[in-house]
Swiss-Prot record:
Disulfide bonds join C48-C63, C55-C72, C62-C87, C74-C85. Belongs to the neurotoxin 19 (CSTX) family. 01 subfamily. The presence of a 'disulfide through disulfide knot' structurally defines this protein as a knottin. It comes from Lycosa singoriensis (Wolf spider). The lineage of its organism: Eukaryota, Metazoa, Ecdysozoa, Arthropoda, Chelicerata. This is U3-lycotoxin-Ls1k. Pfam families: Toxin_35 (PF10530).
Length: 115
């Protein structure tokens, strides 16, 4: 009985040690993968297209506003056959940014009042 108990404790100890090493290996692999993704994103980043400028060359190049990224919107001007694309902020996002700004400002006042 003592031998079985000792063998069981040894087996559990070895199993926990090996699983801890495997988790460390997985954590290291996740960190390496995350760093490589960040490096790729930085290398991929280029100049963004400002609001109301032509974005037909790259429809995903619009700049970010305070909270949201602008959207490349395409349309046909009146009496024209050529499609025109510009970076614009959708109205619902514009209103959400205004509301967030007012909420932040109001939150600062409440914090100031109640210390």
């Amino acid at each position: 009985m003592k031998f079985e108990l000792l063998f069981g404790v040894l087996l559990v100890t070895l199993f926990s040690y090996s699983s801890a090493e495997m988790l460390d290996d997985f954590d290291q692999a996740d960190e390496d993968e995350l760093l490589s993704l960040i490096e790729k994103e930085e290398a991929r980043a280029k100049e963004c297209t400002p609001r109301f400028y032509d974005c037909s060359h790259d429809r995903h190049s619009c700049c970010r506003s305070e909270l949201f990224k602008d959207v490349c919107t395409c349309f046909y001007p009146e009496g024209g056959d050529n499609e025109v694309c510009t970076c614009q902020q959708p109205k619902h996002l514009k209103y959400m940014e205004k509301a967030a700004g007012k909420a932040k400002k109001f939150g600062g006042k409440i914090k100031k009042w109640f210390g």
